[in-house]
Amino acid sequence: QAKGFLVEEMVPPPVGELLVGLRRDPVYGVSLTIGTGGITAELLGDTQTLILPVNADEVLAAISRLRLAPLLTGYRGKPQADLAAAITAIMAMANAMQNDARLDEIEVNPLMVASRGNGAIAADAVIWINDDQGE
């Protein structure tokens, strides 16, 4: 007898996988870390860190500095990744962190980036909320 169901969307293999992490620090403010994601995130240690606020051009520049970047831009005839969708998702997370002081940390790994025009999907995410804001 089933007690529940889990329904998940099937997605095609991504062009690339990103790690996106945002962390609030009382001294430095909010930092944004973008890196090669998925199962190789810790193995490769391929990350770029920015301090918020950031704009889309700065996020694109950080992605472009990753060792993963050639795979996202059509390496050896492969499809190009939907970087616009990835940047939109990253900017939405950054804006959420800036606009809600209760958010301590957001981590998405992987952000699966599909081929151009096909979006980016957060396959796994964790959000830490600080309820000690007096609200």
Regions found by a protein language model. Give the residues of each.
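ATP-dependent carboxylate/acyl-activation modules
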Residues: 1-135
